């Protein structure tokens, strides 16, 4: 069986994690995705001058992939985080979902879901917390969190930690939509016990939809919520809301979404799900997942990948630096970072061909 090889026309690839920066004239740019291949559900974390990016691997080990950078452009793999993960019997597209990595009080904190089933009306999803003083471990024993939902988010507030979970409610009630909003709980990080839930957000727009993958950060006196809407297909998007208090309610940003490729010509389809960090030069960046199709096909053999976008703060809201919400294949690098010369077009290497139908490729890896 011969597998088709893909390559793009960039003269610099951000997946050359350990390579030295390419000498280039200013301004410098990098190509998206910064983590090509199977890197869904990205989450960025800054600790001092270091940046870490985690992605999920679903029903494959290591469960959570970990990368390190000092400039947001050149990334080095640090392996995985979860060394006590049992994925035996986990179905395809189950396993670890949407890791959320934060740094607070001198510790790294990771919350994540383990989905044991993905079929039927009810999903069995457990949520866990691990933490460590050093990003490379040792990590604590997993603490099972006492609230049901998926895609957990940990918020470090002055008066204690909060846990945020999107929640399903499958009761067959008339006029009831299955998604039950984003719920916030007080959390005892040592025992996993939670307080009573408070609904902090529903969705943007007038039509009910599932809102997932939440991340909350504090900036300039506001708490900002970033979340994913539109499912995981071509209508996927990142939306923003904010509140003066950590407990909400979070009000949607005018002109949502922040990032979406829906209805655009961007090669980075299915873009959405991510969070924000301040770069080494003071500029802000948003991470998000994306996927790239084969020309003339619906298939995305490399799965969902991780990308970065430049952000500007306008009237107290984060916006894409180029305007609109369309993700960019080429993005300005932080000032002083030499990332190389890139071009926007992605071309397949047609000297190879597949001997199997695209439908035979794993659906989860196709994104």
What are these regions (language model features)?
Residues 1-367:
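Carbohydrate-active catalytic/glycan-binding domains of CAZyme proteins
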């Amino acid at each position: 069986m011969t597998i088709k090889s893909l390559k793009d026309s960039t003269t610099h690839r951000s997946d050359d994690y350990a390579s030295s920066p390419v000498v280039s004239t200013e301004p410098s740019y990098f190509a998206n995705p910064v983590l090509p291949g199977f890197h869904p559900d990205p989450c960025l974390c800054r600790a001092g001058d270091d940046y870490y990016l985690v992605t999920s691997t679903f029903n494959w080990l290591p469960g959570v992939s970990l990368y390190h950078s000092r400039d947001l452009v050149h990334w080095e793999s640090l392996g995985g985080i979860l060394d006590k993960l049992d994925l035996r019997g986990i179905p395809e597209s189950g396993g670890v979902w949407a890791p959320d990595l934060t740094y607070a009080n001198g510790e790294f904190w990771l919350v994540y879901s383990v989905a044991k089933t993905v079929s039927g009306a009810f999903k069995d999803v457990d949520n866990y917390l691990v933490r460590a003083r050093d990003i490379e471990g040792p990590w604590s024993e997993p603490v099972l969190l006492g609230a049901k939902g998926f895609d957990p988010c940990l918020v470090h507030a002055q008066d204690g930690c909060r846990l945020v979970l999107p929640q399903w409610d499958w009761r067959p009630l008339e006029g009831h939509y299955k998604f039950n909003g984003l719920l916030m709980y007080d959390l005892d990080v040592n025992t996993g016990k939670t307080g009573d839930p408070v609904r902090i957000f529903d969705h943007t727009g007038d039509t009910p939809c599932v809102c997932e993958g939440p991340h909350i950060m504090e900036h300039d006196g506001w708490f900002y919520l970033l979340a994913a809407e539109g499912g995981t297909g071509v209508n996927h998007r990142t939306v923003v809301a904010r509140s003066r208090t950590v407990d909400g309610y979070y009000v949607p940003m005018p002109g949502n979404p922040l990032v979406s490729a829906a209805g655009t010509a961007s090669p980075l389809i299915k873009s959405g799900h991510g969070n924000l960090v301040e770069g080494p030069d003071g500029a802000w960046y948003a991470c998000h997942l994306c996927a790239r199709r084969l020309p003339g096909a619906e298939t995305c053999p490399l799965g969902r990948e991780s990308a970065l976008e430049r952000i500007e703060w306008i009237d107290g809201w984060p916006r894409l630096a180029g305007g609109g919400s369309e993700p960019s294949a080429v993005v300005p690098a932080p000032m002083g970072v030499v990332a190389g010369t890139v071009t926007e077009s992605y071309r397949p290497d047609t000297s190879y061909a597949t001997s199997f139908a695209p439908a035979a490729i794993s659906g989860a890896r196709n994104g």
